[in-house]
């Protein structure tokens, strides 16, 4: 079926409201909203088109997780902003892709299943239906034919396919490592999902526990992830947060030889100039040296065990710096001095190398540790003026090198750093290096409701492991599921409880987990992917959602990518955006996408608070349901109010009573459409204000400054309402201008003005700059320096005309009566003054 992009509007405008038909102060029948929504759907008004030679705009919302609670009024704020831009750009003759879908895997549905016994798939579908109903009621111009959910079988297939691309590149690998185990959720959490030692979701305690995990090597692209932010039109705060999370540091890696001739202890430091002040070395409890020593030293073994239960935050924030001596020493790389090794939990095994050279004179943590354990402090950086007094606390600023040998002493900190790195390189014990705070992404989850990881392993067994016979899985030989066997689907399951087995509930589904091929037994991976997986690439699938042969075609990707406008909450400033950029850059390096970045422009809508100024939540009882607002005032009123509350990015409290202001504006626009007269002449003042309004609204919409655009349209509508004879042209322009923000009202007014076509693809109004210029000004008329009247006069009026108009004022005549005008002062546009005696 071919859609007509200029389908005829409904045959008749909605009849005037019957008594009682209006709601919330709306003076016209709100049935027009359902009417126009049905029209758009019936005529496929917003089905995506891609015309040769036309420019495109890809407008995308961060798609929602369909929770059971549905939307509250804060959610549609960003959706309204993106919809305004999609509608606006269609009227500017762009081809627009504006889709919507559902981030539908995740813990909440699984936890609900554990509590109620209802399968996550059932609750997810019910929640999606409710969300979709709410979004449709608000008149958003989504192309629903491209709707997708990350739980769709066809979508899961391609998510797994991308994982295998990462696996093929060595960017997805297994690692036995300490992870954040949350027994309450029965899964491993990423560092980003933990707040103050508790799970972000549910607030359950988190402990460190060694576990086999799938990890994505995001650090391999750390440099690009940081550097390539520069070309993006993103909020500066978001880019700063991403750079901080990546944490690029320039410094040096230094190798300390162990006394016994074993493997060097390597450390990274940004202050190589302080190397001569190192008095001991600290390794994390997870470090290989600590593990080796712990095999024969009970004190070290006990300390390692105690540390295992602490979170990274607990370890780094503790004021008392605990630790135990390892009983071994390392050799200073330049002096040959022996430095004792300590095991301490303020060093984290997954940060850097898991070891630090301790310079207590110039590092606060090292200073505290040295003070607690009686270790020496050696100052090697003096104040910039050369002062080097005994220290009562660590001196961490730049200064001048001292006590560092003749080749380094006297050098300022930057030069001292370079010199020490040079000396290390000559000795073969170090080199300049860039390090990152960013750690590789722990990707696996021990849960049910997620994409199965498409990997299997060889199994050794003398029986049938599906029947409970003994078996052994060789996890050292991961094999990718062949592409033709994708997707690996989840098995049906009734018991979703994770239990005490860190492998998760899928490990209990023996008929699914184990299978035979070519006479051999194999075991599927029982870990699933995190909720982040589906949201890492959904923007690509929207470009080609019906493709069963590819995740997307090269033609579709080139036609639509990158996303031109991405709208979503600032809470995703780091995680989702960083992960999606990582996947995209891998795909780019494989030649599977044509752009280096997925999202060109990013906008964060500000949070809408409850009327009490607090974040909306059920516990506070301050949640406002958009269904109630739409029922009482209509979708257009809600859209206009949310955009009129203040700047899009600002945090704003919801005040239902203030909707009345935009309702008055709606009523005025509707009333103007009823009385517009095609035969009435367009006066100069009205024409000028019309062009000024088109100019201002156009600039404001381009800048996503919707509150000021609405304000200007209110000014214009007030002017039009005051005209005795109302021409049709300015009302038509107003209907077009208001339509992206209040689309039902815009369509209805357009039809009332005699147009048969929907205005969805009508050209956006143009303004004439020359007609925006004010030709008249209001000037004060003075008599002997005191203002006695005001007159309206052409800005460039001649002196004779100005004198005649000013003198004609009754009040001016009063103060000139009986006096002789000695002088007339006139500066066009500025001063009119009679000097009289």
Language model feature labels by segment:
Residues 265-286, 441, 447-449, 453, ...:
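Conserved phosphate/anionic-ligand binding catalytic regions in large, soluble enzymes, centered on
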Residues 103, 168-182, 432-463, 628-798, ...:
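Helix-rich, typically C-terminal accessory recognition domains appended to large enzymatic cores
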Residues 11-19, 25-28, 34-35, 39-43, ...:
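Residue patterns forming the tRNA-binding/recognition surfaces of aminoacyl-tRNA synthetases
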Residues 12, 16-60, 90-99, 121-132, ...:
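Conserved oxyanion/phosphate-binding beta-strand-loop segments in alpha/beta enzyme cores
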Residues 28, 32-37, 85, 158-377, ...:
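NTP-handling and nucleic-acid-processing catalytic cores
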Residues 48-118, 147-162, 269-270, 274, ...:
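N-terminal catalytic cores of NTP/NDP-binding nucleotidyl/phosphoryl-transfer enzymes
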Residues 1-56, 284-287, 297, 356, ...:
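Basic, alpha-helical terminal appendages of large translation-related enzymes
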């Amino acid at each position: 079926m071919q859609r007509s992009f200029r389908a005829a509007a409904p045959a008749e405008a909605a009849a005037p409201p019957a008594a009682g038909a209006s709601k919330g102060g709306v003076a016209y029948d709100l049935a027009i909203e359902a009417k126009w929504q049905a029209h758009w759907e019936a005529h496929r008004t917003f089905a995506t088109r891609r015309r040769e030679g036309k420019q495109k705009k890809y407008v995308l919302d961060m798609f929602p997780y369909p929770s059971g609670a549905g939307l509250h009024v804060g959610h549609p704020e960003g959706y309204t902003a993106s919809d305004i831009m999609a509608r606006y750009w269609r009227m500017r003759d762009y081809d627009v892709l504006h889709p919507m879908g559902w981030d539908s895997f995740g813990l909440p549905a699984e936890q609900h299943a554990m509590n109620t016994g209802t399968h996550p798939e059932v609750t997810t579908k019910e929640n999606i239906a409710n969300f979709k109903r709410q979004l449709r009621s608000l008149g958003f111009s989504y192309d629903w034919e491209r709707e997708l959910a990350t739980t769709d079988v066809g979508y899961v297939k391609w998510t797994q396919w991308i994982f295998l691309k990462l696996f093929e590149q060595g960017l997805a690998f297994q690692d036995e490592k300490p992870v954040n185990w949350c027994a309450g959720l029965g899964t491993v959490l990423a560092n980003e999902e933990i707040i103050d030692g508790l799970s972000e979701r549910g607030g359950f305690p988190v402990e460190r526990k060694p576990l086999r995990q799938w990890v994505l090597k995001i650090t391999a692209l750390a440099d690009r992830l940081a550097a390539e932010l520069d070309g993006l039109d993103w909020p500066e705060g978001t880019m700063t947060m991403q750079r901080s999370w990546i944490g690029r540091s320039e410094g040096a890696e230094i190798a300390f030889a162990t006394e016994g001739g074993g493997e060097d202890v390597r450390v990274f430091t940004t202050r190589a100039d302080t190397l001569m002040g190192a008095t001991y070395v600290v390794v994390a409890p997870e470090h290989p040296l600590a593990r080796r020593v712990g095999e024969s030293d009970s004190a070290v073994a006990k300390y390692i065990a105690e540390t295992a239960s602490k979170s990274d935050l607990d370890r780094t924030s503790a004021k008392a710096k605990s630790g135990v001596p390892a009983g071994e020493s390392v050799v200073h790389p330049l002096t040959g001095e022996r430095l004792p090794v300590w095991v301490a939990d303020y060093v984290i095994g997954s940060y850097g190398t898991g070891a630090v050279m301790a310079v207590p004179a110039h590092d606060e943590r090292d200073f505290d540790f040295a003070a607690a354990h009686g270790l020496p402090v050696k100052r090697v950086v003096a104040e910039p003026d050369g002062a080097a007094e005994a220290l009562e606390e660590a001196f961490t600023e730049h200064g001048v090198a001292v006590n560092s040998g003749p080749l380094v002493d006297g050098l300022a900190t930057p030069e001292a750093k370079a010199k020490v790195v040079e000396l290390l390189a000559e000795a073969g014990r170090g080199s300049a290096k860039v390090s990152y705070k960013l750690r590789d992404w722990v990707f696996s989850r021990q849960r049910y409701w997620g994409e199965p990881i498409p990997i299997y392993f060889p199994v050794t067994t003398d029986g049938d492991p599906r029947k409970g016979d003994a078996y052994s899985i060789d996890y050292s030989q991961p094999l990718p599921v062949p592409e033709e066997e994708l997707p690996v689907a989840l098995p049906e399951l009734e018991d979703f409880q994770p239990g005490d087995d860190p492998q998760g509930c899928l490990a209990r589904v023996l008929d699914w987990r184990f299978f035979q091929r070519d006479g051999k037994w194999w075991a599927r991976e029982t870990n699933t992917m995190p909720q982040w997986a589906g949201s890492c690439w959904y923007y690509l699938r929207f470009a080609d959602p019906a493709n069963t042969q590819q995740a997307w075609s090269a033609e579709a990707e080139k036609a639509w990518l990158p996303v031109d406008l991405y709208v979503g909450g600032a809470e995703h400033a780091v995680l989702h955006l960083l992960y999606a950029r990582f996947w995209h850059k891998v795909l780019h390096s494989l030649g599977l996408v044509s752009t280096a970045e997925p999202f060109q422009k990013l906008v964060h809508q500000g949070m809408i608070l409850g009327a009490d100024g607090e974040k909306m939540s059920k516990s506070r009882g301050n949640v406002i349901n958009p269904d109630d607002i739409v029922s009482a005032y209509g979708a257009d009123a809600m859209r206009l109010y949310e955009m009129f509350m203040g700047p899009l990015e600002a945090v704003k409290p919801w005040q239902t009573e203030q909707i009345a202001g935009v309702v008055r504006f709606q009523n005025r626009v509707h009333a103007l459409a009823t009385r517009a007269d095609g035969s009435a002449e367009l006066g100069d003042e009205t024409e000028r204000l019309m062009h000024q309004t088109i100019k201002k609204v156009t600039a404001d919409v381009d800048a996503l400054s919707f509150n000021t655009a609405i304000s200007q349209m209110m000014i214009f509508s007030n002017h039009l309402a005051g005209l005795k004879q109302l021409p049709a042209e300015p009302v038509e322009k107003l209907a077009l201008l208001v339509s992206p923000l209040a689309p039902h009202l815009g369509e209805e007014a357009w039809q009332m003005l005699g147009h048969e076509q929907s205005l969805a693809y009508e050209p956006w109004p143009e303004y004439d700059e020359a007609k925006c210029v004010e030709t008249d000004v209001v000037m004060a008329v003075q008599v002997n320096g005191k203002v006695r009247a005001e007159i309206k006069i052409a800005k460039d009026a001649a002196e004779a005309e100005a004198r005649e108009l000013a003198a004609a004022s009754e009040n001016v005549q009063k103060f000139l009566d009986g006096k002789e005008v000695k002088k007339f002062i006139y500066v066009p546009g500025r001063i009119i003054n009679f000097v009289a005696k």
